[in-house]
Amino acid sequence: MANNQAAKKRIEIAERNRLRNRTYKSALRTLMKRCFVACEAYSKEPGDAAKATVSASMNAAFSKIDKAVKVGVLHRNNGAHQKSRLSATVRQVLEPSS
């Protein structure tokens, strides 16, 4: 248990940040899952509407990742890794290698 006021305040701040980071990461994972689902839907039935959905979901996920890095929820290397993983999946679906 914390003995002084500063330590008690740091505990409160850490808990506040933990909750904020948890919601941010949850939203980020949701957007990434939506992008992966859109990729699967496009691979099953290719079309302009499905392609637009993939593109929109990828842009939303990229935006959320960039904001998470900016705020400090994610480390920039982790953000780059997530974006790379997402773009590789999208590239594989949209431009299948012959």
UniProtKB/Swiss-Prot annotation:
Alphabetic keyword roster: Ribonucleoprotein, Ribosomal protein, RNA-binding, rRNA-binding
A biological process term (GO) from this entry: translation
Pfam families attached to this UniProt entry: Ribosomal_S20p (PF01649)
Gene Ontology annotations for the cellular component aspect, listed alphabetically: cytosol; small ribosomal subunit
InterPro entries: Ribosomal_bS20, Ribosomal_bS20_sf
Annotated GO MF terms: small ribosomal subunit rRNA binding; structural constituent of ribosome
SUPFAM superfamilies: Ribosomal protein S20
Family: Belongs to the bacterial ribosomal protein bS20 family.
Role noted for this protein: Binds directly to 16S ribosomal RNA.
Protein name: Small ribosomal subunit protein bS20
Organism per entry: Parasynechococcus marenigrum (strain WH8102)
Gene transcribed to yield this protein: rpsT
